[in-house]
Amino acid sequence: ANSFIDEIAKQNATVKDAAKQHQVSIVKFAGNKTDKVGNDTYREGQYWYNYSQVMKTLAPCTNDTKSAFSSQVNAIQPAGATNAAAGLELAKGQTSDRSDAKKVVIFFTDGTPTEYSEFSPDVASSAVGHAKEMKDAGAAVYSIGIFQGADPAKNPDGQGVSNENKFMHAVSSNYPSATYSYESTSWWSGEYIWNFGDRAKGSDGKDATFYKSATNADDLKHVF
């Protein structure tokens, strides 16, 4: 994340019109969601947890301001679940009013979408839904998997693909219309179903690569 911030500042140094510079916001996600801006925690019983919250609102990232962005990233400490749905919901509110601005969301995660410790279909479904709303509004969503087993090369419709890899594909712009919805199978039960839709294509006609692992996250330098 810090190398990405450095790259944004480097590129902004070549943009003379401040109103047209790339702007950056930082959102963290862990436990309960709060609309307060900052880096706050809350207590449940004997444990403290991170809120899911906006840490820094949208602002130009320049050589003069990049340290403020990096310090926010460096201040994040693991404490709580991985409430991806709350993070992406908060990200929806962090978009520029400039109609000509390219909207990009970069979703870093080091684990499974959870409420506690296991994969949560409910959290994953909501997260995919929030991501789809942003994609429908014209945003490009990159997902970066910083966890063991992250494998963007795997076809999410293939056999033996983990829910985590399916989730990372579905959140990203690899699949613009992806959903993960609850469908009733009888009057008393149902299940969550992945529906990826068509794979987006790059300018070269090949499959789009909006889902990346830590090993190829450096490609983000070429996003803008």
Regions found by a protein language model. Name each.
Residues A1-F224:
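P/S/T/G-enriched low-complexity
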